[in-house]
Amino acid sequence: GNYPKGIIRFLVERYPQIETGFNIIYEGNIPNGASLSSSASIELLTGHLITTLFHINMNRLELVKMGQRVENDFIGVNSGIMDQFIIGFGKKDHAILLDTNTLEYHYVPTEFGTYKISIMNTNKRRELAESKYNERRAECEQALAQLQQHLDVQSLGEITMAQFEAYAHVINDEKLRRRAKHAISENARTKQAYEALKAHDFDTFGQLLNASHASLKDDYEVTGIELDTLAESAQKVEGVLGARMTGAGFAGCAIALVHQDKIKDLERIVTEEYTRTVGYAPSFYHVDIANGVRTLEEV
């Protein structure tokens, strides 16, 4: 309940015309605590509902920033803005390339054709994700501070892999080096994924998903046996182009890009491997990319 409370608090502080109470009933099918942005969905939905109800002309980007502020200042998680941004600016059958430093963004079509996005749920709630997110953020900031003694940069995202390889030795802790390596290499993979989608090169896109998961596992260390089993067993299924964990890690979900004729094979093979390894079954959702938050009249 703190997510709507946070949005309501900040809206009331900013807009004095919100003078009356209201009843809100939430209905949805996003699993809670599954790294599918349920909290950001509640934040943006609540904000959109209240601003519509009270005829407040609030810029969509400001609402997105307010959602992040709820996470940072009301909930106490030092999270980024990606979840709120995609829910605020999502476009049907498109991905978004977002620079979180400048908030500059570009849409790119996701014309997967006969390939579908499958979400694989570990059915294990995230218990460490929020504290570990803050820990990883702090580790990246420590690595950046050491690199800044030799490079004129404001963020790890400004550093190329070639620069990192030349200056990695200045980071005096091996763990911090791996954290920085993940952030920098993931930034490069994201740009490559954007170009692959533009070129309809889904084989390369799938390979980037696989490489991303490997980096999240080995360098950033935010996966765990459940997510690794899902992603790695999915990667072996014929008809799967790629798979990786999604969200904050440690539990929650992974995604796979799979040929529509191989979806049942994916479910069967992954379920068998996951149940044998973890002891219980995962869940699967097959989804399409939809528009962001909107009123029912806009659907």
Regions found by a protein language model. Name each.
Residues H94-G242, L257-V299:
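C-terminal nucleotide
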Residues G1-T110, K262-I263:
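Gly/Ser-rich oxyanion-binding loop with an adjacent helix/lid
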Residues G1, A40, N57, L61-V64, ...:
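Conserved structured core elements
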Residues G33, L53, E195, K217, ...:
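Short, flexible active-site loop motifs that bind/organize anionic cofactors or intermediates
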Residues N29-L44, G239-L257:
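Glycine/serine-rich anion-binding loops at beta->alpha junctions
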Residues T20, I24, T114-K116, G252:
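Residues at beta-strand starts and edge strands
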Residues E62, I87, A254-H259, V299:
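Residue-level recognition of conserved structural "scaffold" positions that shape functional pockets
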